Amino acid sequence: MAILFENLVFGPIHSRRLGNSLGVNLMPVIGKICTFNCVYCECGWNPEHSDTKARLASPAEFERTLDNALAELAGTVKEPDSITFSGNGEPTLHPDFPEIIDITIRLRDKYAPKAVISVLTNGTRIHDKRIFDALNKVDNNICKLDAGSIEMINKINLPNVKINLDEYIADLQKFNGNVVIQTLFVRGTHGNDVLNNTSDEEIESWLQHLKKINPRKTMIYVIDRETPEKNLEKISGAELSLIANKVKALDLDVEYYE
């Protein structure tokens, strides 16, 4: 069953990666809007026809909502470790994303100065300077890189925009290390396509990309919830550990989540 978030701000909930996480969903509460259609996405498949007129929260509405949530949580055991942008699709698609990040930083500093601000993004808009600059301001700029080859990225992420992998890696390099790379490892099938980003060839290409990007951290993980594509295999913790060791051999920080 697909998980869709019904509120602009939700939680806090416990995150495997980010601790006590106060979620932010900038996309409509009625459906998913994303430039990827990942075979493993907990929000399910993209709708055939996205509602381009779906109402998005204004910066003023977002500020009121986040202010109320943080004021209520301040000084309690539920005070968040992270204010996390995820939700029903790609958060950077919101037309006021840069302004919303500035609002979040100001309210975080006021109510929860120990909390980090995290953005989970597929990275398809980092070529836009406004988006790049906004992501560069947050504590955890978490960008997706799910395979070493463009062929496997297209099979796993099913993008509805054209991805130039060389340009994407070059854009990630411009963060000068102020980026966290997230990768979900998976095997399976989708239609006639064989999905496997764990092959020796894919792993080697992926590692070469990491060397160029030099991320502050790499997060690797496996399927944890129901997926829209049913023919997927959850990678074992032992195999994930072996991949993590290859990242460590590059003298890069890595965390893995079974």
Region annotations inferred by a language model:
Residues 1-39, 45-55, 68, 72-78:
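N-terminal [4Fe-4S]-dependent radical SAM core
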Residues 9, 38-41, 141, 181, ...:
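Generic structural hydrophobic/aromatic packing signal, biased to beta-strands
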Residues 21-23, 82, 142, 180:
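Short hydrophobic-acidic sequence motifs that mark active-site Asp/Glu residues
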